[in-house]
């Protein structure tokens, strides 16, 4: 699995290398994006400042991998997932919404898909943030890289009485 090229920025999908998207892990790709850009997905950063756009694959077939595609969007790279979201094979909305979206895509109407992908982007960002929170080595790595306080370290210092103020 190739990592992001250290000399390229995330403003181009070619920074992800030539490895097919279906061979990659969602979590590893997002970790690479965060390391390269220095921006935490799922935080209080405005949408246009986030380095990538997270989308959901509208296909209703069984997903073969976590990631469907990594492609260059209009302004930033787009990562399309197939394991989570409001619509698609694993979607939370009723099946007829996914079928409606697929029908509209065939007619070159992307409005409903793009509208729901606004919410999918936020849901996927928060999903990644929750995963990171419960994987202590990853959360420690992120906190160290961003020069932020690590939650686990704070709890451990509190247990031995060194974190208390006063």
Describe the predicted segments one by one.
Residues 1-92, 100:
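The feature captures two recurrent sequence modes
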Residues 70-166:
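Core of folded catalytic or high-affinity ligand/protein-binding domains
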